[in-house]
UniProtKB/Swiss-Prot annotation:
Entry keyword set: Chaperone, Cytoplasm, GTP-binding, Nickel insertion, Nucleotide-binding
Subunit description: Homodimer. UreD, UreF and UreG form a complex that acts as a GTP-hydrolysis-dependent molecular chaperone, activating the urease apoprotein by helping to assemble the nickel containing metallocenter of UreC. The UreE protein probably delivers the nickel.
Name of the molecule in the record: Urease accessory protein UreG
Binding site for GTP: 13-20
UniProt keyword Chaperone present: yes
GO BP of this protein: urea catabolic process
Sequence similarity: Belongs to the SIMIBI class G3E GTPase family. UreG subfamily.
Record function comment: Facilitates the functional incorporation of the urease nickel metallocenter. This process requires GTP hydrolysis, probably effectuated by UreG.
Record-linked InterPro entries: CobW/HypB/UreG_nucleotide-bd, P-loop_NTPase, UreG
Length: 204
């Protein structure tokens, strides 16, 4: 691959939607295929980066946790400097990085990534939040490059109708893609990887 800036994939979504589980699965699936690293955002701790390290997502020096303080959406949108600095450090440390995953801190449906921080945005919501989540809209649901409706296994327990969520997601997103997933069983993971590779021009 010719030298170029790494593809930066932002993963956003509310607390508990499955962002870190998705990040872990992506790391395990792609770490031997691409020169990659991860930046995680937490408000006052580095819990997500520690989780990825404990679960051996990849070499610990390729996982950077930043503490955003205050509102986590500020660090991915209004003032992305702390994340941009972490990315610069990783690019200096690892020559020829091809892929950097930026996991946001848990936030509301209005949070979006700054275009200067993320080339591709994945937004994760979960079925446990209720079948009304897609129709509530917000930039994450309507404008993300890929909407991921996670934890499909919980639908019977919370009384969520996946058909309704499917119809609402289509209505809210128009032609933009979305998919259902279960990161516990890696259901949907291959489709997410294919999307990243296709959009990131890793594959023809």
């Amino acid at each position: 691959m010719t030298e170029r800036s790494p593809l930066r994939v932002g993963i956003g979504g509310p607390v508990g939607s499955g962002k870190t589980a998705l990040t872990l699965n992506l790391c395990r699936a792609l770490r031997d295929k691409y020169n990659m690293a991860v930046v995680t955002n937490d408000i006052y701790t580095k819990e997500d980066s520690n989780f990825l390290t404990r679960n051996e997502a990849m070499s610990p020096d390729r996982i950077v946790g930043v503490e955003t303080g205050g509102c986590p959406h500020t660090a991915i949108r209004e003032d992305a400097s702390i994340n941009l600095a972490a990315i610069d450090d990783l690019c200096e440390k690892f020559d020829g990085l091809e892929l950097i995953i930026i996991e946001s801190g848990g936030d509301n449906l209005a949070a979006t990534f700054s275009p200067e921080l993320s080339d591709l945005t994945l937004y994760v919501i979960d079925v446990a939040g209720g079948e009304k989540i897609p129709r509530k809209g917000g930039p994450g649901i309507t404008k993300s490059d890929l909407l991921i409706i996670n934890k499909t296994d919980l639908a019977p327990m919370v009384g969520a109708n996946l058909d309704v969520m499917d119809q609402d997601a289509k209505r809210m997103r128009g032609e933009k893609p979305f998919l259902f997933s279960n990161m516990k069983t890696q259901d949907g993971l291959e489709e997410i990887i294919q999307f990243i590779e296709k959009q990131g021009l890793f594959k023809a």
